[in-house]
Amino acid sequence: MAEQRPLTIALVAGETSGDILGAGLIRALKARVPNARFVGVAGPRMQAEGCEAWYEMEELAVMGIVEVLGRLRRLLHIRADLTRRFTELQPDVFVGIDAPDFNITLEGNLKKQGIKTIHYVSPSVWAWRQKRVFKIGRSTNMVLAFLPFEKAFYDKFNVPCRFIGHTMADAMPLDPDKNAARDVLGISHDAHCLALLPGSRGAEVEMLSADFLKTAQLLRQTYPDLEVVVPLVNAKRREQFERIKAEVAPELSVHLLDGMGREAMVASDAALLASGTAALECMLAKCPMVVGYRMKPFTFWLAKRLVKTDYVSLPNLLAGRELVKELLQEECEPHALAEALLPLLANGKTSHAMHDTFRELHQQIRCNADEQAADAVLELAQ
């Protein structure tokens, strides 16, 4: 009698965040099906968990139109080759992790060949280019969504979707230790502390840093003991921020940090940040915040017409109301930002209410996402 083939899962991750998700999923699946086989496009973490890499993840990790155009032929070749090889292999399930521009077409190709497909991490279809939901519905058997309002969106279009919670909510404690974080950063337990996070992209740091620094200067007038911590994602962004600081606020003393964004949020009484994943992380760190964002006028004009949501920050989208002040474009200026931050630094009723809501929202999306994702894969594989 022929030996039964082990459970075979094909995966494609396109960047570091996807590699982390893929590794967590593989770990959860291996705990239940020790002899399962994992193949595809994998980063170092997925490979360390036993995923056989047909291509290195870096091959897909390109950003920006110019870079993508330069690599387009190679990307199309990889996608065609994966379609052919996965079709030959006939895995039990294919899991495309994020990287929607690459993965959703691949998922559609494989679904036509009778392979069950999962898209892990919903693109922001609920916010803009909503018609993409129809292609996603045609291409996948199941979307795994981090956030409850994402599932509600897919339900409207009858696209199978499972809310699994957010891995970041699983990783972060419900009650972070502010004093321990301050000890790590060398900040007094008694001082007022503000975190400035002007974004991870060069364009964001260029647009926001001057206003954020001027805001800190204004707040120092009310709180002379104010410690300002600025975590920057890499050396390039740090150099850029230092250049802007030398021009607009050379005398302002700040703690520049290499990475350590999470520690800065946990340690701070309030944060001023660009929108994006940082706002979700700040919510999970239980740090009251103000979101300030500015973009080129034409980009903003276009975004206002394309974006279908009332809010830009994830805490507000989760709460369904303006929990966190969002100051965009012309409103993103030092006096308005400082005015919004003052009550948060006072550490009174406003910040305590925000903290309590953050904790409730954290509990809502803390669902052991790795295990939930593994459940979905195994159910589909049957």
From Swiss-Prot:
GO function terms (MF aspect): lipid-A-disaccharide synthase activity; phospholipid binding
EC number assigned by the record: 2.4.1.182
Pathway(s) of this molecule: Glycolipid biosynthesis; lipid IV(A) biosynthesis; lipid IV(A) from (3R)-3-hydroxytetradecanoyl-[acyl-carrier-protein] and UDP-N-acetyl-alpha-D-glucosamine: step 5/6
Signal peptide region: none
One GO term (biological process): lipid A biosynthetic process
SUPFAM superfamilies per UniProt: UDP-Glycosyltransferase/glycogen phosphorylase
Family membership: Belongs to the LpxB family.
Name by which UniProt lists this protein: Lipid-A-disaccharide synthase
